């Protein structure tokens, strides 16, 4: 990023040129300001120092804890999709199929979820990231993932009924959509 190029690599000219390309305007590099910041002793501290913890500890803890919670929810959904699809009756139990049929039906269900939710979530992020902004997209994604996960989890028995399968799949897909049109925005941008 331009911020890294200017503040860490100490190359204000390159940072200004990079941002000029992105914003389609000419930006004057502030070499003097970058040099002044580089010489400032208050900006010189180690990664494992109390100054680092004082300046960045709360943000780092907040970021790590939310990503940890997201990863538990997101990767659990991916790992246990087969069990979820079987529980709601979207695919038959494993004992009723041979191994090839089971793999085919699980792969088909996972592909449908990916094509109808995860991939569109990515493209929505690409389309709207410069309009809405990363931060707003991430907040919205975290919020709606939480809403849809609670909407699935709290009345779980409701979703296991035959007549509610389509609704479950839609809600389940929306959690994956908002994973990519949300927290994962910084992963692939």
Swiss-Prot record:
It catalyses: phosphate(in) + H(+)(in) = phosphate(out) + H(+)(out). One of its GO terms (biological process) is response to symbiotic fungus. It comes from Petunia hybrida (Petunia). GO terms for cellular component: plasma membrane. Keywords: Cell membrane, Membrane, Phosphate transport, Symport, Transmembrane, Transmembrane helix, Transport. Residues 77-111, 156-165 are extracellular. It is found in: Cell membrane. The gene is PT2. Its main location: membrane. The chain crosses the membrane at residues 56-76, 112-132, 135-155, 166-186. This is Low affinity inorganic phosphate transporter 2. It is a multi-pass membrane protein. Low-affinity transporter for external inorganic phosphate (Pi). Residues 1-55, 133-134, 187-189 are cytoplasmic. Induction: Slightly repressed during arbuscular mycorrhiza (AM) formation after inoculation with AM fungi (e.g. Glomus intraradices).
